[in-house]
Amino acid sequence: MSWSKVKYFFFDTPEEKEAAQYSYEKEQTDMKKQQDPPEQQDVTFPKAQPKQNVVSIETAKQSSKVVLLEPRTYSEAQGIADHLKGRRAVVINLQRMSTDQAVRIVDFLSGTVYAIGGDIQKIGPKTFMCTPENVDIVGAISELFGEEEDTNIKRW
């Protein structure tokens, strides 16, 4: 077996070599075209505007709301929880409800407030304030009312 036969057996044929050489040359010319810098054009940039340190009050005004509610039945507790989920503080007056229904609502809202990371505080007889995590309650006013409630429920 001659060396040329071995060479053609293991290496490319002359036609393949020519095709490879042609594709190599074509790649080289394409790369040169890509590497040529484009013509320089004059670009004008607008002058930078000074940064304004003004914050819209409307944004802050819309994000903080307090909802006043006076539910009559336990079935309204889910609507109150929806207000809390919407990041709105809620003041609930439970004086027009039976005590057992009011206790159930406070229990439900306590769980809701815990789940969203908020707070619930008593602000008067059968009146509570529930707040989401974006609202802080500072101070206490329950001392002004004293212990004049006539309910038998110790935790209220």
UniProtKB/Swiss-Prot annotation:
Q: Name one GO cellular component term.
A: cytoplasm
Highest taxon of source: Bacteria
Disulfide connectivity for this sequence is: none
Query: Mostly located where?
Result: cytoplasm
| Keyword Lipid biosynthesis tagged | no
Q: Give the span(s) annotated as Disordered.
A: 23-50
Compartments where located: Cytoplasm
Q: Where is the composition biased (Basic and acidic residues)?
A: 23-36
Q: One Pfam family for this entry, by name? A: SepF
Sorted keywords for this record are:
Cell cycle, Cell division, Cytoplasm, Septation
Q: Which GO terms describe its biological process?
A: division septum assembly; FtsZ-dependent cytokinesis
Quaternary data: Homodimer. Interacts with FtsZ.
Q: Which family does it belong to?
A: Belongs to the SepF family.
Question: What is the role of the protein in this entry?
Answer: Cell division protein that is part of the divisome complex and is recruited early to the Z-ring. Probably stimulates Z-ring formation, perhaps through the cross-linking of FtsZ protofilaments. Its function overlaps with FtsA.
In Swiss-Prot or TrEMBL terms, this protein is called Cell division protein SepF
